[in-house]
């Protein structure tokens, strides 16, 4: 039986770990040939091995020359680019009053400038070939005040604005553009950040979240694959939240004194 992405070519940035790796694996399992992009080749090559196909390419998405080289490498292998997933991202925990411009610029360069640069180059290819799909990894932090992540939150809010504008401008070219906003997700970065005791709580009794657990990377990947598929052919310009219900819960009564 044919798979949804048989014969399709997909670029995933930030594919060396976590959500990006899960996205690459899911597309590969659905038949796609996946270009795994990131700054360091070793983890990308591990992702390719887990996918069982595809190839790795080292690039810094915030650097225009690297973005151009990435597109050139893709077109050396493929005749067309069907899907781009802008997943690469970094954060910075410097408190707002202590943050310098270097902290700010580094996060904005990767998280917002990078998707603009890469999307523009890939978008031109897609417009010429008659269509395609561009997807952005945003965050629930785009709509909240999670701290101390001022630069990260601002970059993800910018992604949602870029997402809507791209959807409107690129629709006449047959290009759909959507975003996915993950909630707290179980990745190796999360485990390192919180430690084993807190991780056990987050995985099984996270009472701030209605489903009482973290999101799985595979659940995020499923959202990306759906939005890239023909099953979502009428969907563009949306932001799909995958957070186990976190942003639906105002959590007001639970914080009040019991007496």
Protein language model regions, located:
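Conserved glycine-rich cofactor-binding loop
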Residues: 14-18
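Alpha-helical segment proximal to the catalytic Tyr-Lys
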Residues: 124, 168-172, 233
């Amino acid at each position: 039986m044919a798979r949804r992405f048989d014969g399709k070519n997909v670029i995933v940035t930030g594919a060396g770990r976590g959500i990006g790796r899960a996205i690459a694996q899911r597309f590969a399992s659905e038949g796609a040939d996946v270009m795994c992009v990131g700054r360091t080749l070793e983890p990308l090559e591990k992702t390719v091995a887990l996918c069982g196909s595809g190839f790795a390419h080292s690039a810094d998405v915030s650097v225009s020359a690297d973005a151009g080289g990435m597109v050139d490498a893709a077109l050396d292998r493929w005749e067309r680019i069907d899907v781009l997933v802008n997943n690469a991202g970094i954060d910075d925990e410097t408190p707002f009053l202590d943050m310098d411009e270097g902290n700010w610029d580094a996060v904005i360069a990767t998280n917002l400038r990078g998707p603009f640069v890469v999307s523009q180059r890939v978008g031109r290819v897609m417009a010429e070939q008659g269509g395609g799909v561009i997807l952005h990894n945003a965050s629930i932090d785009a709509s909240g005040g999670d701290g101390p992540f001022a630069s990260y939150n601002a970059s993800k809010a910018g992604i949602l604005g870029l997402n809507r504008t791209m959807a409107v401008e690129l629709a006449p070219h047959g290009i759909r553009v959507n975003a996915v906003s993950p909630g707290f997700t179980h990745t190796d970065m999360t485990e390192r950040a919180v430690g084993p005791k807190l991780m056990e709580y987050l995985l099984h009794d996270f009472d701030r979240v209605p489903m009482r657990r973290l999101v799985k990377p595979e659940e995020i990947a499923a959202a990306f694959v759906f939005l890239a598929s023909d099953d979502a052919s009428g969907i563009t310009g949306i932001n799909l939240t995958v957070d186990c219900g976190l942003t639906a819960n105002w959590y007001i009564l639970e914080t009040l004194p019991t007496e």
